[in-house]
Design a protein with these regions (language model features):
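Active-site core segments that coordinate phosphate-bearing ligands/cofactors
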Residues: 1-130, 138-162
């Protein structure tokens, strides 16, 4: 661990067979799950695949926000708090749920891509492929935006895992 890795909030994690993993935690699709929970509080049901398809069809500039903002780490009214964070950046807040979902997924993709670039730089390695695992690997919009933002190939799966 160096001062540079500490500043980047990167650490080492012991693993199987004496392996050590370079690690940086990034907020995940919990931002989307909590936003949906807020929207469903009125008793309505959100069709997630349909909402993600609508988000994929959103055109024009998509506002990005820092997905790891500590103000977004607690549950409750997350869509409202995300909108406030976007507004603070001076970007227009999406007027639709699909627009906000696109912003959430694009912001996560940017955070993931930035993490991969940072870890590659700190490790002195060129990264060619991102393996996206866990439930997010089923989200084709996330996979595509991550590939677009990182410039790398994204391999999706397995679903039964929780690390990038």
């Amino acid at each position: 661990i160096t001062a540079e890795t500490q500043a980047a909030n990167v650490t080492n994690e012991g693993g199987v067979d004496g392996r050590v993993r370079f690690l940086h935690n990034v907020t995940g699709l919990w931002l989307l799950s909590e936003s949906i929970r807020e929207w469903e509080a009125d008793g309505s049901r959100i069709d997630l695949p349909a909402l993600i398809a609508e988000a994929a069809a959103v055109t024009g500039p998509v506002p990005l926000f820092p997905a790891n903002d500590p103000r977004l780490s607690a549950p409750g009214e997350l869509a409202t708090r995300i909108a406030a964070v976007i507004a603070e950046t001076g970007q227009p807040v999406p007027a639709t749920r699909a627009g906000l979902v696109r912003s959430i997924i694009a912001s996560l993709a940017e955070a993931f891509a930035d993490t991969v670039r940072t870890i590659g730089r700190l490790a002195g390695r060129e990264i060619a492929v991102i393996h996206l695992v866990g439930g997010g690997s089923l989200n084709t919009l996330l996979c595509q935006l991550l590939a677009d933002r990182s410039g790398l190939t994204v391999v999706a799966g397995p679903v039964e895992a929780t690390a990038l």
